[in-house]
């Protein structure tokens, strides 16, 4: 198990026990927390109009679920949106917005949180022998080509 909650224990490998329970509350960015997350207003197949990295305005239609519009909860950069054509239940998290429009570049990079968790996944793969460690900086089957 890998801890995914931000804070001192982020990405800690837990060999016994469980990670902290999901609070359902995203981290606060520029004073916005839960307002950044958009949940499906209805069940059905989603048809996206907007894409990741689009600058969106509050109440702008981002997608449709059947004949129900999915609107932006605030103005900012669309940091994530569920894949077009996916069937969603009502209430499912389907998108999130970063209120910092100047941070559009973050849509194309790996976050600190993702990088930390990926490092822990690699640690587990190596320690369990799933991914053999051959020499410093080199892994089995990976070439520079």
List the predicted regions and their residue ranges.
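Well-ordered secondary-structure scaffolds
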Residues: 1-145
């Amino acid at each position: 198990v890998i801890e995914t909650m931000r804070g001192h224990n982020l990405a800690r490998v837990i060999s016994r026990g469980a990670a902290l329970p999901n609070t359902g509350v995203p981290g606060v960015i520029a004073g916005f927390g839960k307002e950044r997350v958009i949940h499906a207003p209805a069940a059905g197949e989603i048809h996206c109009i907007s894409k990741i990295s689009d600058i969106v305005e509050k109440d702008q239609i981002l997608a449709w679920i059947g004949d129900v519009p999915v609107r932006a909860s605030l103005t900012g950069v669309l940091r994530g949106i569920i894949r077009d054509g996916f069937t969603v239940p009502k209430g499912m998290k389907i998108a999130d917005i970063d209120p910092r429009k100047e941070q559009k570049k973050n849509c194309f990079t790996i976050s600190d949180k993702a990088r930390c968790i990926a490092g822990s996944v690699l640690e587990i793969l190596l320690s369990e022998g799933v991914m053999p460690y051959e020499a410093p900086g080199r892994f089995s089957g990976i070439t520079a080509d």
